[in-house]
């Protein structure tokens, strides 16, 4: 089903490799979003509880997420410092120390809930057209976010949602060959929430030198 949006919306005019648009978008509001939050929350809580039990009993098995991509793979050393810097800033705003596992889990659970935003979004890309399908999806998302902001609507990519495919499989008919790459949220940012005042540092774009 094609998304019904204004013809002058920039998000439908975004560039695409040979106009293939080899990605799909699923949107959830109302009761469907509530079911998704419950499902995601349950999977998240089960994993956290399993880790707590494993600390007491090494034989406890940790549930393995059914993600389509290795979302928890360690960041390469070249970019890891930037990732650590943002993590320290994020948890610091919440007053959470590195050793505070429960506190970190509370923050991450808010991500899983998509911050209770009225719209939850999910993006799928054709596996046989990677990396171009992922590039197109990224162009679409950035354009969508900018277009939404121009209308007073805030947004946030929520990559942690791609840790589990099961919840979206239960709610949407996903075309064969499409892989779940990221989620996102649309709504209105709480101006009183300290996290919304966070300004993440942006490493400079690295230009390659000519030979």
Label for each model-derived stretch:
Residues 1-211:
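Acidic, surface-exposed loops and disordered segments
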């Amino acid at each position: 089903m094609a998304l019904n949006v204004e013809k002058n919306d920039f998000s439908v005019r975004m560039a695409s490799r040979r106009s293939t648009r080899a990605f799909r978008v699923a949107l959830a509001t109302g009761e469907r979003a509530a079911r998704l939050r419950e499902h995601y929350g349950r999977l998240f809580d089960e994993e956290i509880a399993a880790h707590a039990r494993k600390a007491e009993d090494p034989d406890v098995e940790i549930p393995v997420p059914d993600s389509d991509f290795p979302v928890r793979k360690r960041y390469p050393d070249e970019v890891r410092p930037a990732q650590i810097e943002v993590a320290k800033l994020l948890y610091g705003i919440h007053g959470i120390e590195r050793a505070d596992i429960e506190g970190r889990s509370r923050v991450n659970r808010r991500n899983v809930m998509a911050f209770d935003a009225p719209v939850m979004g999910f993006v799928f890309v054709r596996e046989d057209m990677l990396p171009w399908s992922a590039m197109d999806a990224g162009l679409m998302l950035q354009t969508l976010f900018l277009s939404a902001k121009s209308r007073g609507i805030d947004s946030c990519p929520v990559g942690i949602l791609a840790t589990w495919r099961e919840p979206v499989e239960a709610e949407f008919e996903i075309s064969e060959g499409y892989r779940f790459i990221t989620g996102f949220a649309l709504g209105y940012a709480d101006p009183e929430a300290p996290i919304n005042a966070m300004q993440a540092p942006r490493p400079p774009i690295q230009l390659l030198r000519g030979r």
